[in-house]
Every structure is written in C-alpha cells, then in structure tokens.
Amino acid sequence: MSYKTELHCHTAEVSDCATASAEWVVNKYIETGYDTLFITNHMSRHTFGIGKQQKYHGGENWNEKMDFYFEGFRLVTEIAKDKNLNILLGVELNSNTDGNDYLIYGLDEEFYRSFPDILDAPLKDVIGKVHKAGGLFFQPHPFRNSIKIKKPAMLDGIEAFNGHIGHDSRNDIANMWADKYGLMKLSGSDMHHEKHTPNGGILTDMPITSEKQLVEILKSGSYTPLHIGEDPVITQN
C-alpha cells in the first residue's frame, strides 16, 4: 500500500481553534508525502459565533454560514490545484445535543446546506440522514477528557489514532474499544497548528480521489491506518 490519505485536518480560515493557514497546510502535506487530504473543519456554534478567534462575520441565515464554511474548503482546493494533492471534503461536527465531535465522510456540500438543523437535531436523526445519503459517521478521539463515548451501535467507527500533540486522546484504549466492538478504525493527525507535523491517516493500494471512494474503501477494510493505538508526544495546544 503506497498511497497516503489524511482524514482529519483543520485550517485557520474556518476552524476557530486552528492557526495553520490553508496554504501552509497544502504545502506541508505535499512535503510529507500525502496523496490525498480530507479537510474536516469544525462545523459548530463556535465556527459561526465568537470563539477563540472570531472569523465568521455574517448573519444567522444558514446558507450564509455555509457560504463561509465552504469558501474555506474551496480555498484549499484552489491552492492545491496542479500540485498533485487531492483535496476532499469531510466535516467535524460538534453537536449541540451532547457537546461531542463527530467526523462525517462521503457527503457533498448540498447535504449540509439542506440540513440547517444539523447542529441541534437529535444525534440519531443526524446519523440516519448521513447513512441515508451514503455517508459514514465516526467519533474522533473518543477517550479524550470531556468527551462522552457513544454507544458502539450508533457509530460506524472511531479514531484509534488521533495525532493532536496538545491532547491525551488515549489512543491505546480507543484501539482496544474498536476491537472489542468491531468498529472501523480511523487514524488522523487532527492538524491545527504549524508546530504540528502530519502523523496520521491511512494507506491504500490506490489514490483516493473522491468522497464516495473513501466510503467504499473504509467499508471494504482495504486500508491500513497509521500508528493505531500509539500516542503522540503531548506538548501543548
């Protein structure tokens, strides 16, 4: 398996807790040998309000919020154009119902634009719509402090490696949990800042060039997740 794909990455233009710019992210992932990069910026009340650093200055209209959110994704796509790095869409949803983060893959912009209640809807309704549309629903860093682990039957899988150097994600426990309940295992760098080095993702026999292809590969198990069960050296956020 020789193609490397990042599944968890944020950029400063959208995620309120990120400081790594889209341009830096693209160049860093090319430098470190990745073929595909999923941008999974936070979709949360903080994204569209006052967080650590307010970036959204629009109104309450959902389409206005989505314009802001997807402008960030399109910026990464434009920067990576002709640079031999596939840029694909994922979303890290922060649900108002439980405060947890969730990674969603396999869906397009229209799905999110057509679901203005996604932040407040009961989680079972969100998962149902994701699955009906052909997507997958994962819990990242499920054993990090303040996170509430969800019932395995609700999830397609979990992150068994989260590479954020500012948090103890207890990847060893996550790996054992995934084994115990037969969950798909993800690996992601959880890139936020320039002092982070890409350290997560999956290896595949072919390059991943579409969101739907990722879903097929994950369901088939035809991938190798990087650093499963290992913990990065924790420094600071």
Briefly describe each language-model feature range.
Residues 1-7, 11, 21-27, 48, ...:
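Charged catalytic cores and adjacent phosphate/nucleic-acid-binding surfaces used
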Residues 16-17, 68, 117-118, 166, ...:
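Residues that cap or flank secondary-structure elements
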Residues 39, 87-89, 139-140, 185-187:
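General beta-strand structural signal in soluble alpha/beta enzymes
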